[in-house]
Design a protein with these regions (language model features):
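N-terminal [4Fe-4S]-dependent radical SAM core
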Residues: 15-68
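Single conserved hydrophobic/aromatic residue that forms the stacking wall/gate
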Residues: 1-3, 7, 11
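Canonical Radical SAM [4Fe-4S] cluster-binding loop centered on the CxxxCxxC motif
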Residues: 60-62, 66-95
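Radical SAM enzyme [4Fe-4S]-AdoMet core and its adjacent flexible, acidic
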Residues: 4-5, 176-289, 298-299, 303, ...
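Short cysteine clusters
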Residues: 10, 75, 79-82, 286, ...
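Short, charged low-complexity linear segments at domain edges
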Residues: 43-64, 274-276, 280, 314-330
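Flexible mid-to-C-terminal extensions adjoining Fe-S/redox cofactors in radical SAM and related proteins
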Residues: 307-412
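Radical SAM/AdoMet-radical enzyme domain recognition
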Residues: 95-115, 121-235
Length: 412
């Protein structure tokens, strides 16, 4: 029983995961811990999964595990290379809009809701009110962290089902360089408040060609642990938007370094690390298009992915189930996985011909209302990257398959 042996080893050796679990148990508010267990583990992964499977079979379409949505396109910062900034800053989903999305989602077994933006905490009061109304759901928000204060942390303690993932770019120089002078100190203050009040939170980090060494260093992992973060979610820079800086795309050598470094840190540091782009092997490739999540922007447009702003569905005009049956979402359903090598999972970044075909076939339009980007322009920025990454991805993929074969042989 491999999993049982791993659990026994974790306890016996007092390894990094043992330390992580012990710190979570000892340092998290017990009522918050109980609510996370009920909403995330029981509702989101046991009760909800059964309902989702029923809908998948009945309607022959994707049903997501989580819904990402933008309460607002407004933000108090303007970060370099931010895909969300492309939407402008005057759009909002009303309280009733979000309430309806969540209500519909729960009917299909969806209990996980993730706020993006814009800066979601511009809508603090509505976010807390939604947590109260839907106290059987787990809410997470990607946030720059600058609007987290004592009062909001107390509200988090009251509702118990809200968790922030705070965006940082590394240490002070890198964070302030991309997010604005003084941002880092505000973020550190927010994390101090959360840690003091025994509220769990994580880190969201975007790696680029410019920050990849510092943001993945052992020292940075130690700093995140010191801040009190329980997880870190790494995102590969995406060249989305007409003005995207393609020079920020990591080189194949840098991405390969991240592939190995994150796996190394997982075995050494007491924080759970995820890499949205390089961990495709654990989730069967692309999870967008409603396979595990979709994205609803502040205008109500339903994008298959938070990074792919094309759609022919709007939540104001159709139900959530109808969105999942719309042309672009069905194209994802029918086309996934987009590559058998799950280190090349994305129909845009690593397989740009796929998203071009999907958009043209389904007649999807750009949902970027401020500066619409043609799919040809988007794909043109990815073609060279995809070509350069393919040999490295194929090498790594074959090595991983061989490792798995050898491990399976040893367990016989």
């Amino acid at each position: 029983y491999p999993l049982r042996r791993q659990r026994q080893m974790c306890i016996r050796d007092r390894n990094n995961y043992y330390k992580l679990m012990m710190s979570i148990l000892k340092e998290t508010d017990p009522d918050v811990m109980k609510k996370i267990f009920e909403n995330f583990f029981v509702n989101g992964n046991l009760v909800g999964w059964k309902k989702q499977e029923e809908y998948r079979k009945k309607y022959n379409c994707n049903i997501p595990w989580a819904v990402l949505l933008d309460p607002t396109s407004a933000c108090n910062l303007h970060c370099t290379g931010c895909w969300a900034a492309e939407y402008g800053n005057r759009l909002n989903l009303t309280f009733d809009d979000i309430d309806s999305i969540i209500t519909q989602g729960k009917e299909m077994g969806i209990y996980m809701y993730i706020y993006t933006g814009g800066e979601p905490l511009v809508r603090k009061q509505d976010i807390i009110a939604l947590c109260k109304k839907h106290n059987d759901c787990q809410f997470l928000s990607f946030t720059n962290g600058t609007l987290i204060d004592e009062e909001f942390a107390d509200a988090m303690l009251e509702v118990k089902n809200f968790m922030p993932a705070i965006s940082v770019e590394g240490f002070e120089e890198a964070t302030d360089g991309r997010r604005g002078q003084g941002t880092f100190s505000k973020v550190v203050k927010a994390m101090e408040i959360l840690k003091r009040k025994h509220l769990p939170f994580g880190i969201s980090a975007c790696y680029t060609s410019q920050n990849i060494d510092s943001i993945s260093s052992s020292e940075f992992f130690d700093q995140m642990i010191e801040w009190g973060a329980r997880f870190v979610w790494y995102f590969h820079y995406m060249p989305v938007g007409n003005d995207a800086a393609t020079e920020l795309l990591p080189t194949p050598e840098q991405r390969e370094y991240m592939f190995h470094q994150i796996r190394k840190m997982r075995m050494e540091k007491s924080i759970f690390a995820m890499d949205f782009q390089n961990d495709g092997e654990y989730v069967g490739g692309c999870i967008a298009g409603g396979r595990r999540y979709l994205h609803i922007n502040a205008n109500g447009d339903c994008d298959p992915c938070v990074f792919i702003h094309y759609s022919n569905a709007n939540i104001h005009d159709m139900s959530l189930l109808e969105v999942m049956q719309s042309p672009i979402f069905m194209a994802y359903h029918d086309g996934q996985p987009f590559n058998d090598n799950h280190l090349r999972p994305c129909p845009m970044l690593e397989n740009p011909e796929k998203i071009k075909e999907i958009v043209e076939k389904t007649g999807a339009r750009s949902t970027d209302l401020q500066s619409p980007e043609s799919v040809e322009h988007l794909c043109g920025k990815c073609e060279s990257y995809a070509c350069n990454w393919t040999p490295t991805a194929n090498k790594l993929w074959e090595e991983r398959q061989e490792e798995k074969r050898q491990k399976k042989q040893q367990q016989k």
